[in-house]
Swiss-Prot record:
The species this protein was found in: Chlamydia muridarum (strain MoPn / Nigg)
Boundaries of every Clp R domain copy: 18-161
GO cellular component: cytoplasm
Identification of the protein by name: Probable ATP-dependent Clp protease ATP-binding subunit
Stretches assigned to the UVR domain: 460-495
TM ranges: none
Length: 870
């Protein structure tokens, strides 16, 4: 190479050198020139090339240097320390190449030739400057405690990994062993330096595209596998068969299919397997990694063929393909075959053993359609574990999560994670959802306790304040004050360092516990149920429920008592857990509190009125309207939108579902509710089972309400309990006449609401007045309504046929309308603080305490204010 350069005219030497340089290598030269100009150097040395390589930020050389801990800033500081800046002179043109740089370029070309590369890249440039024993770049690396031999080893590894992604030459294909060995022998002594052996170990296809589970378990990188002994035993039996010894684990996502395979790896490592499996290696094949980067036809087939050849060669390899359905169609291009067709002959002959894992749906869609592929695999159906088995699994994983989050997990938290996830987290399966609850609970506790103590924060603020005062003193040339502040800052920093060390040690010693409350908070975030309601004693909460409802739903104590009894039966576990928490039919006249009671149940049981899903059954008067509830069938308009009811329950599975006025719906539509009431589920148009087990089903109806109005014995009060019993029998008869027996039998209870008595209406008026008073507080006003006015409002608003709703209009007409006019008056807005109401000849008069101001309201006309009245 030196002779060739001498025979070339000097003006053409650089052109010859850069002829094979890649774009990145040329960019390195440009960056190196800029670094030379920055340092005021009129030459380009090996140190500038090193800085150019690091500043480029990409390429094999940069990856290797970063792996060894060398970055641009570190190298730049070392170069500046060694050679410093040049004199401040104007440099015209490009800096001249030093002799060492020219030799390094020659060496880079030689390295590329040795590696049989027809280009010079950043890796060759790095090897070239390493060959200059007296170069500044090599001295910089040695000062940074970097061994050149390590750089060469890392470059070789990087190049071998890269070669696996190119069309094979091939280092992994057995048919090309001659070219592979010759290439290896040439690259074993790059630049005349040994790489730690006569021949470098080639990167195998299995190592490139897979992960050795048995090796990972030896290194304690896998979680322990608890239980699943039956599935692991069946897996071992299938693997020990002579033919068709390829098991496939089929189960829903999250039931632990991959964990079963890891359990097999655990048994292989511990020797708890038959002799035929004792020396086996279990390797997970990453199919996505194998497909990635295959730009040319035949590359994918070569890679998978190399894996199969290596499995045949070793003879002790068990392949595990997670998401087995991905092999169908994987790598198939125009004129090519997919992975499943490549694997099928070897699987049939027993040349390779493969363990698959996939879900039930994916197995049906992809594997079962290919009968030849299906018969080569033996199915193992994996069912979700029970709650007790999940608790044992969590106990086995407890230590791993304690170490990760640096917390202490109580046994109560493990039990709560299993039970609460099974009860409240739907659409997913144990043990995955229980593990996720425990993991998030540990993260929540850890994050909440990571904050620094207030004393540390105060000390840091004091240090910052002292530092600013010191800088200000330096700026004003008060050097004695600055020196004093410097000493004070030093003391504060020492104190801060000691406090931080003590805090860190205390944090490590005193682990924060993860208890049942922490798990309940995670469930609360995921489901919307207040955590306090989950952890509160059930007996206390259910005893409080009846009293709370009676305070808000007036005059229906018997109905409230009936629904509370049914809820107690459900929540104490006496009822069937596969049915809804409660299903009720509310009967009675309008305006007596049926919908209000449903709203209050939503508030008390689920924390808010937004947990009430209200379905107006008058929208389902036609038979075909049933599709609106659960979604249109496939092929019909609106299929992708889903059902109005099913989609709402999917998004909020913990709610009160109110079917209003069910007698207006088509009778056939009521048949849809049979499976909701009996089995606690409804299948939507997509085939998904919507869970109603954590809902309270309430239906309202006015059936038999006319009987209450026609009964002369019942006015605003019942004469005796027998009178109410007679009416109940008549209403029950009307319900049985209109609704089917199979529907009525599935209800927990039919609740009949009584007409409101006068005392109940008086309490309702007081509730409305209290609401009005709370709204007036925003205007700094207080309201005083005497009993005489309340009695007047009750007399004006009561109606046995209309219930309590007329009371709202009475309050608006006699109280809210005149108050609104008073608020609009400037004098009232500024001065009024407390308003008193008086009843004068069926007029409600409002007066201020400091100055009498009356506002008369005619019972049959709009509110008005006159000077005489005030």
């Amino acid at each position: 190479m030196s002779y060739m350069l001498k025979s070339i005219p000097p003006r053409h030497i650089q052109v010859f050198m850069f002829e094979k340089f890649t774009n990145r290598a040329k960019q390195v030269i440009k960056l190196a020139k800029k670094e030379a100009q920055r340092l005021n150097h009129n030459y380009l040395g090996t140190e500038h090339i090193l800085l150019g390589l690091l500043k480029l930020g990409q390429g094999v050389a940069v990856n290797v240097l970063r792996t060894l801990g060398v970055d641009f800033d570190t190298a730049k500081n070392e170069v500046e320390r060694l050679i410093g800046y040049g004199p401040e002179i104007q440099v015209y043109g490009d800096p001249a190449l030093t002799g060492r740089v020219k030799k390094s370029f020659e060496s880079a070309n030689e390295e590329a030739s040795i590696l049989e590369h027809n280009y010079v890249g950043t890796e060759h440039l790095l090897l070239g400057i390493l060959n200059q024993a007296d170069g500044v770049a090599l001295q910089v690396l040695e000062n940074l405690h970097i061994d050149p031999k390590e750089i060469r080893k890392e470059i070789l590894k990087e190049l071998e990994t890269f070669n696996l992604q190119l069309p094979p030459s091939s280092s992994i294909t057995p048919r090309n062993t001659n070219s592979s060995s010759s290439s290896s022998s040439k690259s074993s002594s790059l630049g005349g330096h040994s790489l730690g052996g006569d021949k470098p170990e080639k990167l195998s296809a299995l190592k490139a595209y897979g992960y050795d589970l048995t090796e990972m378990f030896k290194e304690a990188r896998l979680d322990p596998v608890i239980g699943r002994s039956a599935e692991v035993e069946r897996l071992i039996l299938i693997l020990c068969r002579r033919r068709k010894n390829n098991p496939v684990l089929i189960g829903e996502a999250g039931v632990g299919k991959t964990a079963i395979v890891e359990g097999l790896a655990q048994k292989i490592v511990s020797g708890e397997v038959p002799e035929a499996l004792r020396k086996k290696r279990l390797i997970t094949l990453d199919l996505a990694l194998m497909i990635a980067g295959t730009k040319y036809r035949g590359q994918f087939e070569e890679r998978i063929k190399a894996v199969m050849d290596e499995v045949r060669k070793h003879g002790n390899i068990l392949l595990f393909i997670d998401e087995l359905h991905t092999i169908v169609g994987a790598g198939a291009a125009e004129g090519a075959i997919d992975a499943s067709h490549i694997l099928k002959p070897a699987l049939a002959r027993g040349e390779i053993q493969c363990i698959g894992a996939t879900t039930l749906d994916e197995y049906r869609k992809h594997i079962e359609k290919d009968a030849a592929l299906e018969r080569r695999f033996q199915k193992i159906v994996v069912q979700p574990p029970s709650v007790d088995e999940t608790v044992e699994i969590l106990r086995g994983l407890k230590k791993k999560y304690e170490e990760h989050h640096n917390v202490f997990i109580t046994d109560e938290a493990l039990v709560a994670a299993a039970k609460l996830s099974d009860q409240y987290v739907h659409g997913r399966f144990l043990p995955d959802k229980a593990i996720d609850l425990l993991d998030e609970a540990g993260a929540r506790v850890r994050v909440n306790t990571m904050g620094q103590p207030s004393e540390l924060l105060r000390l840091e603020a004091e240090i910052e304040s002292t530092k600013q005062a010191k800088e200000q003193a330096i700026g004003t040339q008060e050097y004695e004050k600055a020196a004093s502040l410097r000493d004070e800052e030093k003391k504060l920093r020492e104190k801060l360092s000691n406090m931080k060390q003590q805090w860190e040690s205390n944090k490590e010693e005193h682990q924060v516990p993860v208890d049942e409350e922490a798990v309940a908070q995670v469930v609360s975030v995921q489901t919307g149920i207040p955590a306090a309601r989950l952890t509160e004693a059930e007996s206390e909460k259910l005893l409080m429920l009846e009293n709370t409802l009676q305070k808000k739903v007036i005059g229906q104590d018997q109905a409230v008592a009936s629904i509370c009894r049914a809820i107690r039966r459900s929540r104490t576990g006496i009822k069937d857990p596969n049915r809804p928490m409660g299903s009720f039919l509310f009967l009675g006249p309008t305006g007596v509190g049926k919908t209000l009671l449903a709203q209050q149940i939503a508030v008390e049981m689920f924390g808010g009125e937004d947990s009430l899903i209200q379905v107006d059954m008058s929208e389902y008067m036609e038979k075909f309207a049933a599709t609106k509830m659960m979604g249109s069938p496939p092929g019909y308009v609106g299929h992708e939108e889903g059902g109005h009811l099913t989609e709402q329950v999917r998004r909020r599975p913990y709610c009160v579902v109110l079917f209003d006025e069910i007698e207006k719906a088509h009778p056939d539509i009521m048949d849809l509710m049979l499976q909701i009431l009996e089995q606690g589920r409804l299948t939507d148009s997509f085939g998904r089972k919507i869970d109603f087990r954590n809902t309270i089903i309430i239906m309202t109806s006015n059936l038999g309400a006319d009987l209450i109005r026609k009964t002369g014995e019942i006015g605003f009060g019942l004469r005796s309990h027998m009178d109410y019993g007679v009416i109940k029998e008549k209403i029950d008869a009307a319900v049985k006449k209109h609704l089917k027996p199979e529907f009525i039998n599935r209800l927990d209870e039919s609740v009949i609401f009584k007409p409101l008595e006068k005392e109940a209406l008086s309490e309702i008026i007081h509730l409305e007045i209290n609401k009005l008073g709370s709204r007036l507080q925003n205007h700094q006003m207080a309201l005083n309504i005497p009993d005489s006015v309340v009695s007047f409002l009750v007399d004006k608003g009561h109606s046995p046929e209309m219930g309590a709703r007329p009371l709202r209009r009475v309050v608006e007409q006699y109280l809210e309308d005149p108050l609104a006019e008073m608020l609009l008056k400037e004098s009232c807005r500024q001065e009024a603080r407390k308003l008193c109401a008086r009843l004068i000849e069926e007029r409600v008069i409002f007066e201020r305490e400091d100055e009498i101001s009356a506002l008369a309201v005619e019972g049959d006309g709009p509110a008005s204010v006159t000077a005489d009245e005030s």
